[in-house]
Every structure is written in structure tokens, then in C-alpha cells.
Amino acid sequence: MVLQKNWQSLIKPEKLEVEPGGEPLRTATVVAEPLERGFGMTLGNAIRRVLLSSLQGAAVTAIQIDGVLHEFSSVAGVREDVTDIVLNVKQLALRMHGEGPKRMVLTATGPGEVRAGQIQTGHDIEVMNPDLVICTLDEGVKFGMEFTVNLGKGYVPAAANRPEDAPIGLIPVDAIYSPVRRVSYKVEPTRVGQVTDYDRLLLTVETNGAVTPEDAVALAARILQDQLQLFINFDEPRPVRTEEPQDDLPFNRNLLRKVDELELSVRSANCLKNDNIVYIGDLVQKTEQEMLRTPNFGRKSLNEIKEVLTSMGLSLGMNVPAWPPENIEDLAKRLDEPF
């Protein structure tokens, strides 16, 4: 029980909101509250670093242009030289379904601008910024180009994208795989009930459209969860299982007991009474935030109640669909066994 207090005594964020930015699929602010004091900075910095470094994405790793042998060439009738075309290609935002590498093809005839939306991608790749200009062609010029696309994370320089058996004319490209463009966070104070020293975390995320900001944050949190699992070197005690009553109730029999039987401190008991909480079934449906809003109810009382409920295999914030039963008083009278 003492071991569990290390994490059970801490308040957990119960409210997660997503505030859309100018482009809802690309920019948004994810707000989480309440957090223990200091946890806003701890979680915000960790999630930000993972968002920028570790999310998988798709990027162009190499190109081939008809009639071009190397990146320091120029193409007749194309206003941009090959180096400028490569810089434009690096700005392509792609979403790829399945494993790579994949191939895309671009063919165009001048005059006019050649845009990313003209690329033939197939069913496995989506171009998220179709208005991106790849190059500009003069009258009557025919232009052909192939792209190699792959999945990865972070940044991979062009030299690492050149295969050993690269054909003549293959131009490797710096691959920026991360779908996240910018991340910032700030921590604001927030209050729960009478307590005012909690944190409110605001994560502002901008992506290239291949993943939404909300999903990006969820992926980063999952990565952190997976990496931290190794450090947990103990098994959590299992909740005490209680026998179900003969009435075949759809909930734990302890929910029918009155909170007076919990042997709480006078302060905690009075707070529950003033909030019209009679049965344990009424109590467990309350969240930590709701309890802390109760007048004169503080962290000490909250921890006391959580500890007692845990010993019974219960917790705050439970969903009890069939509560309260119509014959609750009759059922409660049958429970004369002591805890």
C-alpha cells in the first residue's frame, strides 16, 4: 500500500482539450490539466523533444530527372537549376500507407509552373501540399522526373540515401522525415477546488498535415510510455477481489455500503455528508477534481479516501451504469458482513 502511494497520491490530468489553430489539421494547442506542480514542465519538455525527434514520417530520398546526370546541372527550358529543384522537393509533405520504398512519377509540358499536385503518386502516397511549386517550364518544354519515397524518422543526409549500386543520374536528397514542424509549450497555474498550485500544460504543435497535432501528441506520449516501461522493476499489487452477492448485481457489492462504514476522519466524513454522498456507490462516481471542489475538502482527505477505496478494489471516477438500484435500501440491509 505504501508503494502505491507514490503514484496514487498524485493528482492525474482529467481534462484534455484541443484548441484548433488557423489550419485545424496542421496547427492546434493541446491543453492538459490539472497536473502536479512541476509536472507541466517535466511532461511538456519530454513530449516536445519526442515530437521533434521520434515520430515516423515519409520523405523523398532520391530523384532522377530526364537528361540530368548530377545535381549541378541545368535543364534546357527549365528556369530553375537542379539544385533549386532539389530544394523544392525537400519541402514536399507526404503521407505514406504501408512500407517503403515507393516510387512517384512527374511528367509535364510547358509553359507554366509544375506543382506537387501533378505528381502521380499511386494509392499508397498522398501529397499534403499540392500547391508546392517544383519548377517552371518554358513554352513547349517536356519535363520528366521520378521520386523515391521512404519511411523514417528525424533527419537523414543525402549521402546516407545514396545506395551502393546507385545508377548514373540518381540524385540523393536530404530526407526530413518528421511530420512535426514546430512545437512549443508553456505552463500556467490552475486550481482545483481550494488548491491553486497545480499546473496547466499547453502544447502548441504544427505539423505538415500528414498527422494531426492531436494524434502527434498521442504518438509521442505512447513512445514515452513504451520507453519508461523498462524502469518499472516491481509488480503492482492486484486489487482485493470481493465476492458478489447472491442477488447477481452488475456491480461490486461494496458499493451498497454507506460511507459511514469507511471509518474516515471526522473532517472527511463531514465533507461527504455535506455533499450528500450516502453510499460508496455515490462516492466512486466522483472524480478527483469534483472531490477537491467540495468545501473544506483537501488533499489529505482525498488521499485517505483513495487509499480506503483501493483496499476494496474500487477507485474514484468509476462508471457504474446500473447505479443506483431501485431497491437500494433493501439490498443494503442484507449486507451485514463486516469489512
UniProtKB/Swiss-Prot annotation:
Superkingdom classification of source: Bacteria
One Pfam entry name: RNA_pol_A_bac
Catalytic reaction equation(s): RNA(n) + a ribonucleoside 5'-triphosphate = RNA(n+1) + diphosphate
Cellular component, GO annotation: cytoplasm; DNA-directed RNA polymerase complex
Keywords recorded for this protein, A-Z: DNA-directed RNA polymerase, Nucleotidyltransferase, Transcription, Transferase
Region (Alpha C-terminal domain (alpha-CTD)): 251-339
Stored NCBIfam families: PRK05182.1-2, PRK05182.2-5, rpoA
Biological role: DNA-dependent RNA polymerase catalyzes the transcription of DNA into RNA using the four ribonucleoside triphosphates as substrates.
Protein family membership: Belongs to the RNA polymerase alpha chain family.
Domain comment quoted from the record: The N-terminal domain is essential for RNAP assembly and basal transcription, whereas the C-terminal domain is involved in interaction with transcriptional regulators and with upstream promoter elements.
Name this protein carries in UniProt: DNA-directed RNA polymerase subunit alpha
Organism of provenance: Gluconacetobacter diazotrophicus (strain ATCC 49037 / DSM 5601 / CCUG 37298 / CIP 103539 / LMG 7603 / PAl5)
Gene label: rpoA
